Amino acid sequence: MHIRTTEQFPYSVIEEDLRIPMPDGTRLYARVWRPDIAGPEHPVPVLLEYLPYRLSDWTAPRDAQRHPWYAGHGYASVRVDVRGQGNSEGLPGDEYDETELADGVAVLEWLAAQPWSTGRTGMFGISWGGFNSLQLAARAPESLHAVVTVCSADDRYDNDVHYTGGSVLAVDMHAWASTMLAFFSRPPDPRHIGDDWRDMWRQRLEALDPLIHTWLDHQTRDDYWKHGSVCEDYSAIQAPVLAVGGWHDPYRDTVLRLVEHLPREGTAPVRGLIGPWSHQYPDRGLPPGPAIGFLQETLRWWDHWLKDEDTGVLEEPLLRSWISESHPPATVYPELPGRWVGDARWPSAGVTMTTWGLPGAASAGPVLVRSPQHTGVDAGRYFPFGNDSDLPPDQREEDSRSVCFDYDPLAEPLEILGRPRVRLRLTSEVPRGQVIARVCDVAPDGSSTLVTRGVLNLSARHGRDRVVDWEPGATEDVELDLNGIGHAFPAGHRIRLALSSAYWPWVWPQPGSAAGWSVEPAASALDLPVRDAVAAGDAERPAITFEEPEQAEPLDVRYPEVPGQRPERVVVRDVAADEWRLEVDPRYGGTRIYPDGLEFTEDALETYTIGASDPGSARTRSDWSIRLRRPELGWDVRIRVRSEITADGADFRTWNEVVCAEGETEVFRRCWERRIPRTAG
């Protein structure tokens, strides 16, 4: 899709770098884009994006397309680096810790008090910035009048990168912890900081502690995870929220929960928007599309709440969502076929949870589900970013490693919208295990497209805040909610429910997972949220449309070609050892050269290994390298991070190493090794 670049705005834009003082004297690095009229005579509302990702380089290309656009439409748009990151002073902390959130409140107060500010602020962001926008809204700072949160979560334990269904999310807990260790090791930029950069860097390095330690120390939903989880008290959010997600983003269920639990009307209402997108802003044009004019859509939100203009945002349905038409399996889709629908309430009057008994249940006895441990190698990327190998390929191989229940071919089309639920009667002979359920769209040619899935750690079946081991030999009924989805099954296709006892590397295998478990089909069912267009009132509502994507002029960043680039995603089988290895290049950025002369190179490789019959053989490894170079200053810094995780029945074992060099001289090296008791995950 073509993305229009806009160079002419209603207002000319002024860009300025600032240091924002915190109550303890620490200064946070900020960049503000303001309309040229902004001042005491013509104050403007302020928008804040607050991230740890380095505004002077890492997010600079994205920032250049968004913040000047808002400024050109009459807002002061501000990007701030979190304490201890980028060119901000102080030491790095944990995700969304108390210091970060207290600083965020102070930043909003400072921005509201500036002579060019009306005193009304809005906050927006994707992922981390979407998280802390919600978290700060729950603190109800006086100036915060509106929020746009994109691809974020209301539940830090069960809907983030650490745990899923009570199980350790092996694929992303480790990868993200290693990424953060590499990111936290980056120095300030001497072009912006001057000679103090080296002392600041040394202080940051000495304060490092791998976050994987903390995350594995908290294997159930305790107070650590409740901090920053706005689902603990939705009523604390006192600002209007536009919640945005994509069906191919792991955080999409947060949008469904927010539109259910936040008020539809009043002084702080919510509106939800879920498209076909991955973990990206909806206007970037990255697969899967279609992209939308997201900046224009958010401008309507800001103008309504920060300028008191009637833009019609409250006349929109509570939830606007994309329902994808059936499509052949592929690892990337430039655009998906489908349509936009609107629902005035959530749960919607147009959606009915319909029970589907398992096929053949009347004549079937207990069925053993005992999957090989490499089931899951075709799961696709947990965080799709629009890369060529992100999405799950044809699921037939995964289905062959699972127990599948195929329904009869549909006599007529069937649309679902929401979160399917699977109810199972299980018998397990071991105390620990996990259930993975997938719903697939099976075409007449046999191809199997993943529609949605879900995970349950059986020891978390009575709640994510407790561990209840299974009594060997006992039979119990369990339920698991699958991820939300909007999907249209066509007539002639089959719906498939696939059950497995392993899903590597998404789920770290439990010690007894090789034993599997038995399911009683006659006492089990699949519940589907079936949407009826008539009951939903589609014909009575104007068609849902969006403008074409539009952005400010892109930053002139050069990306030199890298010869011999390795594949993004490779599955290797060692036949003699019966071992499977998944190698992933997350494509974080390669080499780029910025207009100010900075050369920035990143490389990452993730490796996930497991034996087909041995859950104790699971191993994850992450290798990171970063180089920052300014030839005109003689500045050349290199960072290397290596980390591994293994586990047995009793403990997780972690190993992390950080090595930093200035030029050819090593200036820092530290290694951490820990054994962490395996209490739940």
Positions of PLM-derived features:
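Glycine-rich nucleophile elbow surrounding the catalytic serine of serine-hydrolase chemistry
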Residues: I126-Q135
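N-terminal cap/lid segment of alpha/beta-hydrolase-fold proteins
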Residues: H2-H42, D406, L410-E412
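C-terminal, loop-rich substrate-recognition/catalytic regions characterized by aromatic stacking residues
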Residues: L273, Y281, P287-A661, T665-G681
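Cap/lid segment of the alpha/beta-hydrolase catalytic domain
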Residues: I37-A112, V161-H162, A437-D445, W504
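Accessory cap/linker subdomain of secreted extracellular hydrolases
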Residues: D63-A64, G72, A138-A236
